[in-house]
Amino acid sequence: MLRIQALTKTYKNGEAALRGVSLSVGAGEIIGLIGPSGAGKSTLIRCVNRLIEPSSGRVQLGEVELTGLSSGALRRERRRIGMIFQEYALIERLTVMENVLAGRLGYTGFWNSWFRRFAEQDIQRAIALLERVGLIDHIDKRADALSGGQRQRVGIARALIQQPELLLVDEPTASLDPKTSRSVMRLLTELCIENRLAAIVNIHDVVLAQAFLPRIVGLNAGIVVYDGPASGLTAEVLTSIYGEEDWTRTAAGDGGTDDGEPLIIARMEAAQ
């Protein structure tokens, strides 16, 4: 479904953010991307849809190689890719409904976009999505009146209304409290399964990654150092990803209780 081959990114200052990353993601497969700060996780996600231009390598979505597309063709192909951001990227003065419908702008003509006129089927799908993410009672509320967890749910609904084939998710829980983080991750993974969506989730919390993401890819200094099941994150593997002292702090978690936590604790104890 998605194939990344020998992808590199070197910035003008000579810093190599990605060093020959190769990765395949199947239809409906959800993977977690973990690693220390500066490992290249966000760069990798942004290179997939060319928000950042890679220096070399290939990114292929289905039968289409994204790295070779013109700007016009790239805009069309980006409709197949939903993006969920850490900072939410909502339009503060617009309502929840209007922010969700913004995900359909790529399918709407200029004047309809200008006057925010959307097809009835888009409106009905937005309502259904807001019902699913638990925000139907906030449909007319402005985005700047929402909590962090609610804002992230709007971002999820906006990405899904595109009806994408792939989701790129960049630190969806970084600004959220532990309980809300688990709720958002559960919702995100459930929606991917329900819609058979492939997803790459850049996540800083190893405990959350283990609890909700069956396959983990570990990056260190722009290199893939681990690609395997969450259950394979042993102390040795985590050290190769984070370093001798850093992984225990990253994996410490929030200490809360929720579905799946006994499994998380067992994994962490086994790793130690």
Curated annotation (Swiss-Prot):
Please give the PROSITE patterns that the UniProt record associates with this protein.
Answer: ABC_TRANSPORTER_1, ABC_TRANSPORTER_2, PHNC
Protein name (Swiss-Prot/TrEMBL): Phosphonates import ATP-binding protein PhnC 1
Q: Which positions does UniProt annotate for ATP binding? A: G35, P36, S37, G38, A39, G40, K41, S42
Q: Which SMART domains match?
A: AAA (SM00382)
Signal peptide span: none
Enzyme Commission number(s) from the entry: 7.3.2.2
Query: Where does the record place it?
Result: Cell inner membrane
Kindly list the organism's lineage.
Bacteria, Pseudomonadati, Pseudomonadota, Alphaproteobacteria, Hyphomicrobiales
GO MF annotation list: ABC-type phosphonate transporter activity; ATP binding; ATP hydrolysis activity
Family, as annotated: Belongs to the ABC transporter superfamily. Phosphonates importer (TC 3.A.1.9.1) family.
Query: Which residues does the UniProt record annotate as the domain ABC transporter?
Result: 2-246
Reaction equation(s) it catalyzes: phosphonate(out) + ATP + H2O = phosphonate(in) + ADP + phosphate + H(+)
- Subunit structure of this chain's protein: The complex is composed of two ATP-binding proteins (PhnC), two transmembrane proteins (PhnE) and a solute-binding protein (PhnD).
Question: How would you classify this enzyme at the top EC level?
Answer: translocase
Q: Which GO terms describe its cellular component?
A: plasma membrane
| UniProt keyword terms in alphabetical order | ATP-binding, Cell inner membrane, Cell membrane, Membrane, Nucleotide-binding, Phosphonate transport, Translocase, Transport
